[in-house]
């Protein structure tokens, strides 16, 4: 059987907090926790999904490329968000297919570009709104900072986008004073000063 590990960020690195062997497609972990925390489930050395380690019975389902975590309030919220994001990602993929179809159907490049740009901008705004609303709704629990930091980790180096600025500007102090967020914001501002 394969080994699964639950890892959480601590002092700048990922630390194993639990592990289990997968036997006949099933595994079980148990433990005590002081407060909810964002974690990643790893199979061997590969991260396969994010989850919230919190009090309750957490159900993890991995089948046919679909990963879901449910059974606790924050995981239900997280995976509702993931489902909405996946739906937008699917629509983005469809826009790329539409572009090819329009070209094959003999539409002018100008017509193709106008339509595709409009669709991409619409999707981009929907994605930004989804992320912003989710983080703002979850400022006060582990999901807001967790998703914000995942978003930040997607950049090659710390920087601030208009979306990140808006999220931070409206955030309560508890969010802004989160150690990792504070560190990111300081690094992003230092990078901005270096560029100016």
Predicted regions and their residues:
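A short, acidic, amphipathic alpha-helical segment used as a generic capping/interface helix at domain edges
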Residues: 129-135
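A non-transmembrane, solvent-exposed segment enriched in polar/low-complexity residues
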Residues: 1-128
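Charged, long alpha-helical assembly modules
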Residues: 136-196
């Amino acid at each position: 059987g394969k080994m699964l590990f639950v890892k959480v960020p601590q002092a700048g690195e990922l630390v194993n907090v639990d592990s289990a062997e997968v036997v006949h497609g099933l595994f079980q972990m148990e433990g005590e926790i002081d407060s909810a925390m964002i974690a990643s489930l790893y199979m061997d050395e590969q991260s396969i999904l994010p989850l919230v380690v919190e009090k309750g019975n957490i159900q993890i389902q991995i089948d046919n490329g679909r990963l879901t975590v449910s059974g606790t309030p924050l995981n239900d919220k997280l995976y509702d968000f993931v489902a909405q994001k996946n739906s937008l990602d699917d629509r983005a993929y469809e826009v790329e297919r539409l572009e090819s179809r329009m070209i094959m159907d003999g539409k002018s490049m100008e017509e193709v570009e106008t339509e595709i740009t409009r669709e991409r901008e619409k999707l981009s705004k929907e994605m930004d709104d989804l992320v912003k609303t989710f983080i703002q709704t979850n400022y006060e629990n582990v999901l807001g900072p967790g998703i914000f930091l995942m978003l930040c980790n997607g950049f090659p180096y710390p920087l601030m986008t208009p979306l990140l600025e808006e999220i931070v500007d409206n955030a309560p102090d508890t969010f802004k004073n989160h150690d990792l967020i504070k560190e990111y914001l300081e690094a992003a501002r230092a990078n901005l000063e270096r560029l100016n």
